[in-house]
Amino acid sequence: MRTYDISNETMPRYLLLTDLDGCLLDSETYSFDDARPALNALRAEHIPIILVSGKTRAEFDPLRERLDHRYPFIVENGAAVYVPLDTFSFSPERSRRRSSYHVIELGTPYALLRDVLRQIEEAVGTPLRGFGDLSIEEIMATTGLLREDALRAKLREFDEPFLVNGPPKLIEEICRQIVTRGLNWTRGGRFFHLTGNNDKGRAAEILLRCYRRQGQLQDPPEEIETIGIGDSLNDLPLLLTVDHPVLVQRPDGSYDPDINLPNLIRASGRGPAGWNQVVLDLLRHTTQEAAREQTVNIRVT
């Protein structure tokens, strides 16, 4: 995998932050083949892709190899930010070195989350099955992951996905129990998630501050615009953080009804195909804007 040396590249004008499952990756096959045209276009324009997911650190390794990904990434729904060492000319605040990364940890330890899930299960009188309770075979059946990928998904550090079967009132009570214990919850494509005081938006904002700081160190200083892509409620904090929020259709062709922002862009497609189309459309728009700005600058000079 290539390393990114900030001294050899100018700062990007745009950053794209994206959810994975159901967006860049197909929710059933986990393929990104339909998104390859947009991925190639982003690479040609030197636009960093920041991967933001509920996936574990262990799951990211093979995925980043497949994508030839060299930029920062955010794991377990904003629980930790991983920044390759050569990304910035400084060490991010509150980071520690871990292998070839600066790591900023924001999440609550997994063991504590498991204990709280058991407490809530007892309080509501209903079994709650977390990832830690599922066998590898059950994870494979629920998610469609291959065995090796399911094993990697089990290596959780900060976020406990769990399954709930019951009426809305039960779900409301479970969520209330979580909040009264000083923790948070969110909903992804398949699971609810028990987390600490972290989310995708908070992690993204910390990373964006680093990019903006680096941009101000350039001569002349560079401003950065941000694009964020998601498909479900756990992506809402991310979409609230960026300049251009994008919502991809769910597998059934609908949009998550809990996400409704005034400047929201709705992709006219689902999964990586919808992701591909909306990214290409945005790139065309930014190219046209850049051409207009260049024309104005020429006229002024």
Question: Over which residues does each language-model region extend?
Answer:
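Short hydrophobic/aromatic-enriched beta-strand-loop microsegments
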Residues: R70-E76, E148-A150, P245-R250
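Mg2+-dependent phosphoryl-transfer enzymes with acidic/Ser/Thr/Gly-rich catalytic loops
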Residues: I6-M11, F32, F191-T301
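Short, structured coil segments at secondary-structure junctions
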Residues: R66-H69, E76-N77, R181, T241-V242, ...
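Active-site phosphate-binding/coordination module
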Residues: F32-G130
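Hydrophobic "anchor" residues on beta-strands that sit immediately upstream
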Residues: L15, P72, I227
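Conserved acidic, metal-coordinating active-site core of Asp-based
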Residues: I120-I227
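Asp-based phosphoryl-transfer active-site loop
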Residues: P12-T29, L239
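A short, Lys/Arg-enriched amphipathic alpha-helix followed by its capping loop at the start of a domain
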Residues: T10, Y14-T18, D34-I47, C210, ...
